[in-house]
Amino acid sequence: MEKDIYDTLKGLVANRVFPDFAPVDTPRPYITWQQVGGKVINTLANTTPDKKNAVVQVNVWADTRASANPLALQVEAALRTSSLFVAMPEAAFVGSYDADVPVYGTRQDFSIWSAR
């Protein structure tokens, strides 16, 4: 799933897609993501399922709110329409701002079903 997320989003930000966090000197905009949970599939036959689920938080980071929000919508569209997995937003994105950097961001959780 990790490679599939990268492959789905890399074209939006010139390959600047990172699990967990980006290097400090990464040019903006960029995307980070991390798994924050998911559903477990249990079978009565005690077998390993061929699918897995992850709730993935996707973060967009940009220099301005005016550039972060449209990119967040592009991320949502790219994940929803990916042929590599099935992704469904859990809710709309939430805006954020880190005054220490400073950087504008969004975060949105997606339930992603993929091959195991």
State what each model feature region is.
Residues 77-116:
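Acidic-leaning, charged glycine-interspersed low-complexity segments
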Residues 1-46, 66, 70-77, 82, ...:
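Small/polar-rich, solvent-exposed N-terminal microdomains that initiate assembly or binding
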Residues 52-56, 66-73, 93-98:
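Low-complexity, flexible helical/coil segments
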Residues 50-63, 104-115:
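Oligomerization/assembly interface segments of phage tail-like spikes and tubes
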Residues 49, 61-67, 87-92:
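Short C-terminal domain-edge/linker segments immediately following a structured domain
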